[in-house]
């Protein structure tokens, strides 16, 4: 599988409690086939964060990679936008 063929998602970090692992919620908008209404779907992915740079609330980009554990199939590419702490 080529590196360019791999899936790349952008989502929000919802958990960073594990060491070197983040949970990213990716939201997609799909039009309902019968009713035509736009429906939001959210799916959570566990991603590898080698240096623990991503924090809860950050917008990050993750890319598909080889299986790193039972659930981890993605790695952190970049932090697109850092969360604002008030």
Swiss-Prot record:
One of its GO terms (biological process) is translation. Keywords: Ribonucleoprotein, Ribosomal protein, RNA-binding, rRNA-binding. SUPFAM superfamilies: Nucleic acid-binding proteins. Gene3D superfamilies: Nucleic acid-binding proteins. InterPro entries: NA-bd_OB-fold (IPR012340), Ribosomal_uS17 (IPR000266), Ribosomal_uS17_bact/chlr (IPR019984), Ribosomal_uS17_CS (IPR019979). GO terms for cellular component: cytosolic small ribosomal subunit. One of its GO terms (molecular function) is rRNA binding. It comes from the Bacteria. Part of the 30S ribosomal subunit. Belongs to the universal ribosomal protein uS17 family. One of the primary rRNA binding proteins, it binds specifically to the 5'-end of 16S ribosomal RNA. NCBIfam families: PRK05610.1, uS17_bact. HAMAP family: Ribosomal_uS17_B. This is Small ribosomal subunit protein uS17. It comes from Exiguobacterium sp. (strain ATCC BAA-1283 / AT1b). The lineage of its organism: Bacteria, Bacillati, Bacillota, Bacilli, Bacillales.
């Amino acid at each position: 599988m080529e590196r360019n063929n791999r899936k790349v998602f952008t989502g929000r970090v919802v958990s960073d409690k594990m060491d070197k692992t983040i949970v990213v919620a990716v939201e997609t908008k799909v039009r309902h086939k019968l009713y035509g209404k736009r429906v939001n779907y959210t799916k959570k992915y566990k991603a590898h964060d080698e240096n623990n740079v991503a924090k809860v609330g950050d917008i990050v980009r993750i890319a598909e990679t080889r299986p790193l554990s039972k659930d981890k199939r993605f790695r952190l590419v970049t932090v697109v936008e850092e969360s604002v702490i008030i």
